[in-house]
Structure formats: C-alpha cells, structure tokens
A protein has these predicted regions:
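C-terminal output helix
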Residues: 105-114
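Receiver (REC) domain active-site loop signature in two-component systems and cognate sites
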Residues: 56
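Short, conserved "switch-loop" micro-motifs in signal-transduction and mechanochemical regulators
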Residues: 83-84
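Active-site beta3 strand of CheY-like receiver
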Residues: 45-51
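Acidic catalytic/metal-coordinating carboxylates
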Residues: 34-37, 60-63
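Two-component/phosphorelay signaling modules centered on CheY-like receiver
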Residues: 11-30
Length: 120
C-alpha cells in the first residue's frame, strides 16, 4: 500500500493515525512535529501521501503545504486538522491540498479519503 508521512504536533493524533493507517495496510515512513520538520522529512522520504495538521508550533501546516507544493507539484497532501474553519479549508485547497478532513473523524473516513487521493 502507500508510504505515508504524518505531520502533527499532537502525539495522540500521530499515534491514532499511525495505528489506523497500519491496520489499513499503509506504511508510516516518518512522523514530524511541525511544518519545517514535515518539509524536511517529505523530501528525505518522498512519501506517496502526507497527512498534515494546520496549527503547529513554528511553521504551520498551510505554510509547509505551500513550500512542498512549490517544489513538488504532484505531492498528495491531506490536511487533517481541528482548525476546521471554512477559511482554513479554502486556503489549503487553493494552495494545493488534495483534500481536507476535520478532527474528530471516524477511521473509515480518512481511509476512504486516502484511497480516493491515491487513485487521482
């Protein structure tokens, strides 16, 4: 299945996503705690897909998304965040996010979205 990078400052969220993705047959190749670390690990591991939080210390998810897309326009990045204001969703999609999921969510939702994004 897919090689995935998780970018989220919440240890609980990273663990939840990692367990859920593993149970669906995906491999989490790396985890990052903030946007800059996410950018660095993206270009180190070149994953098939990234799940990215928006609100993180240091470089936020929207900035990291923008920097990754500028360097790799084919990057598949799903924003997975509690910061679910419509303005965040619109901004992320305008800057190249593949999709947007608001926390909390059910496991089947993210698995279905990942499948859809990978097939695009």
């Amino acid at each position: 299945m897919a090689k995935i990078l998780i970018v989220d400052d919440s240890k609980t969220s990273r663990r939840f996503l990692k367990d859920m993705l593993a149970s669906a047959g995906h491999e989490v190749v790396a985890e990052a705690l903030n946007g800059q670390e996410g950018i660095d690990k993206y270009f180190e591991y070149m994953p098939d897909l990234v799940t990215m939080d928006i609100t993180m210390p240091g470089k936020d998810g929207i900035t990291a998304l923008t920097e990754i897309i500028e360097r790799d326009s084919k990057a598949k990045i799903i924003m997975v965040t509690a910061a679910g204001q419509k303005s965040n969703m619109i901004e992320a999609l305008k800057r190249g996010a593949s999709d947007f999921i608001q926390k909390p969510f059910e496991a089947n939702i993210i698995i279905d979205v990942i499948k859809k994004v990978l097939e695009e």
